[in-house]
Amino acid sequence: LLELPRVMFGALEQDTARRIAATQDAGFAGYEVSNIAHLRLCRGLSMTGGFGLNITNNVAAQFYAEQGLSSLLILPEVKDSDIASIAPACNGKPVPTGVMIYGHMPLMLTRACPLQNIHDCAHCDKTGVLTDRKAKKFPVRCGLGVRTIYNPVPIYMGDKPGALAVDY
């Protein structure tokens, strides 16, 4: 799967469309879409729903299933007991759902660089850290014209393998 950018500002939308056209016959399994605009860019191609679609309920899951997504990632904010109720179907067949089991969740996307007071973009290695008043360190990663600020505490659901009603 090729992951598409969660946000596309300005020329990045055209660049993303160009890259999709260049890779659609390259043997990849499809595209992970994280933005509703990706549905149009990938129309007719194999798509799976990623984190950026914010799937937290059956209405959203059903909408994306009807748009042709072959599987969907449910946000970790959904209670374990509610995951089973998010069960989309398309043409009478269930659409697989999944959850993130481990990782640092993105908290915020920003176009302005929060690290700019430390160094300019020309001297940046595209990684950094913001420290809050409680000394928590929030990783910052830059790319494709945006900066992503991550939660310093990773989610972990590896201790619930049988309790999660998902396919992956």
Give the location of each predicted region.
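Active-site pocket-lining/capping segments in soluble small-molecule metabolic enzymes
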Residues: 1-168
